[in-house]
UniProtKB/Swiss-Prot annotation:
GO terms for cellular component: cytoplasm. The lineage of its organism: Bacteria, Pseudomonadati, Pseudomonadota, Gammaproteobacteria, Enterobacterales. Disulfide bonds: none annotated. It comes from Blochmanniella pennsylvanica (strain BPEN). Keywords: Cytoplasm, Stress response. SUPFAM superfamilies: YccV-like. This is Heat shock protein HspQ. GO terms for molecular function: DNA binding.
Length: 105
């Protein structure tokens, strides 16, 4: 079993670029495309660690979906971001959905 450092709905920062993001899904290992044999031997450690689907905002404030390795992300300790309220709202909405049980008919 692979343990992930971050959870769905959690706000994170891109370590290199500093962008704020919200995790919307987690893959236990890289899963966008099937790697070639050469790629497997070169990047096996990176591919076998968790990868995250993260929503971030571009320079114009438009949401964008990114796929990032765990090593590219850092914790975000600040809960509110006046300059990026939509990401705060997305994070809160996801966390509430995960905490609130749904009634199914």
């Amino acid at each position: 079993m692979i343990a992930s450092k971050f959870g769905i709905g959690q706000q994170v920062r891109h370590k290199l670029l500093g962008y704020l993001g919200v995790i919307i899904d987690i893959d236990p290992e890289y899963s966008l495309e099937k790697p070639t044999l050469d790629e497997i031997t070169k990047n096996d450690t990176l591919r076998k660690s968790p990868w995250y689907h993260v929503v971030m905002e571009d320079e114009e404030g438009k949401p964008m979906h990114t796929y990032l390795a765990e090593v590219q992300l850092g914790y975000e300790n600040i809960l509110t971001h006046p300059e990026q309220t939509t990401l705060d709202e997305l994070s809160e909405s996801i966390r509430l959905q995960l905490q609130t049980p749904r009634l199914r008919n």
